[in-house]
């Protein structure tokens, strides 16, 4: 009976949306809020076996939809790490490595100054933003530096087309595939660093970085803790080609949404951060209960949490970061007391926000490698 209703509702969604979008692309507010809730009601499962069958289908369509059934050849070149800056309790270094032959990931590596026997590793994909762009923004620098001061090794890298990643435009047709490859290779890079505890690896990002967070976590079990911020929505599918520009949500009668994709994190610890000013406004009543049910199928309902800030907007602001710090400390065994004041509140004051020029990877002394493939057309051929 549920299958019948899924076919009916699928036909309704298609009729309602196909005139304005390609038939198998679900972009932006593809569903209405009511449709998003109805979809979750109809796809909710009552057994672990049923969910694992569904999750296998979802993972397969993500890979098929972004044409990533297999990863491209892994380059043999070594990562370049230089430009170390010693800060208050942490250091920052510039990083360049190939994610596939001819394409370079660019970013910054934040490390704690205090020596430890092993280190948690945290990936910090960033969201869309200008003046400055993603990894140079205050909220991103504070997030990365504070996590490093808590004892983690943190890597933040550029979205394609932003920062130092200027080999193609951000809105290139296969940006979703390229960014997913970059995310997986960033995980490879972080995991390869000396002292990284592979059982303490996490990912957290906001907006488009939230999309990168839950897609990476869905596809790669090496991510043990996930904190997608202001992105998981029953009705909103991501408004950029880097999130929804390839058919990962729909094929024929098959349909999913980002709530189901985020649910693939189960039973690993996950914190959903939501607010009242964007498409996550319904999280406590719609998205969170659905994901709780999935975790409950594993007997791990305690490992999924939601912090909802009804009076806040779409960002990774201080209160959202505060919630994330506590969650990361809990599950990655980080030292949150080392960054807290006498009242127990996280103090980001020691973090110095640097100018973009201080975090830039490429300059006259460190030019872009000569084998870098340039231009959308050339990058599309690589993909």
Region spans (language model):
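Alpha/beta-hydrolase fold nucleophile elbow
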Residues: 195-207
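Alpha/beta-hydrolase-fold catalytic nucleophile elbow
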Residues: 204, 229-230, 309
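Alpha/beta-hydrolase-fold serine-hydrolase catalytic core, especially in secreted/extracellular enzymes
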Residues: 18-104, 273-383
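Cap/lid segment of the alpha/beta-hydrolase catalytic domain
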Residues: 115-192, 231-242, 247
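Mobile cap/lid helix-loop segments that gate and shape the active-site cleft of serine hydrolases
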Residues: 223-263, 268, 275-288, 294-300
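Bacterial Sec-dependent N-terminal signal peptides
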Residues: 1-25
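Loop/turn elements at helix/coil->beta-strand transitions in domains of secreted/extracellular proteins
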Residues: 118-120, 150-153, 197-200, 221-225, ...
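Glycine-rich nucleophile elbow surrounding the catalytic serine of serine-hydrolase chemistry
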Residues: 205-217
């Amino acid at each position: 009976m549920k299958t019948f209703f899924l076919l009916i509702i699928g036909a309704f969604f298609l009729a309602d949306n196909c005139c304005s979008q390609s038939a198998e692309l679900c972009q932006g507010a593809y569903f209405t809020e009511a449709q998003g809730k109805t979809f979750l009601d109809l796809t909710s499962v009552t057994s672990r076996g049923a969910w694992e069958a569904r999750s296998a289908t979802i993972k397969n369509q993500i890979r098929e939809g972004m044409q990533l059934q297999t990863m491209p050849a892994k380059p043999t070149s070594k990562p370049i790490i230089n430009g170390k800056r010693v800060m208050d309790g942490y250091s920052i270094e510039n990083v360049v490595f190939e994610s596939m032959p001819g394409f370079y990931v660019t970013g910054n590596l934040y490390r704690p100054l205090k020596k430890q026997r092993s280190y948690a590793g945290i990936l910090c994909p960033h969201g869309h933003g200008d003046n400055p762009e993603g990894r140079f923004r205050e909220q991103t620098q504070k997030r990365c530096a504070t996590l490093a001061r808590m004892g983690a090794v943190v890597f933040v890298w550029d979205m394609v087309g932003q920062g130092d990643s200027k080999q193609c435009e951000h809105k290139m047709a296969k940006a979703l595939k390229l960014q997913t490859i970059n995310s997986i290779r960033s995980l490879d890079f972080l995991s390869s660093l000396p002292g990284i505890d592979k059982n303490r690896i996490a990912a957290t990002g906001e907006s488009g970085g939230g999309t990168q967070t839950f897609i990476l976590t869905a596809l790669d079990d090496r991510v043990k803790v996930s904190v997608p911020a202001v992105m998981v929505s029953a009705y909103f599918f991501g408004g950029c080609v880097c999130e929804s520009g390839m058919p990962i949500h729909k094929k024929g009668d098959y349909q999913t949404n980002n709530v189901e994709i985020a649910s693939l994190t189960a039973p690993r610890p996950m914190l959903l951060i939501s607010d009242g000013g964007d498409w996550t406004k319904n999280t406590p009543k719609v998205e969170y209960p659905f994901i709780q049910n999935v975790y409950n199928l594993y007997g791990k309902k305690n490992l999924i949490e939601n912090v909802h800030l009804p009076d806040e907007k779409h960002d990774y602001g201080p209160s959202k970061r505060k919630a994330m710090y506590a969650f990361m400390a809990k599950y990655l065994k980080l030292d949150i007391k080392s960054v807290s004041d006498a009242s127990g509140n996280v103090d980001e004051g020691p973090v110095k926000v640097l100018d973009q020029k201080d975090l830039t990877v490429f300059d006259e002394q460190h030019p872009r490698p000569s084998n870098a493939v340039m231009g959308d057309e050339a990058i599309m051929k690589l993909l």
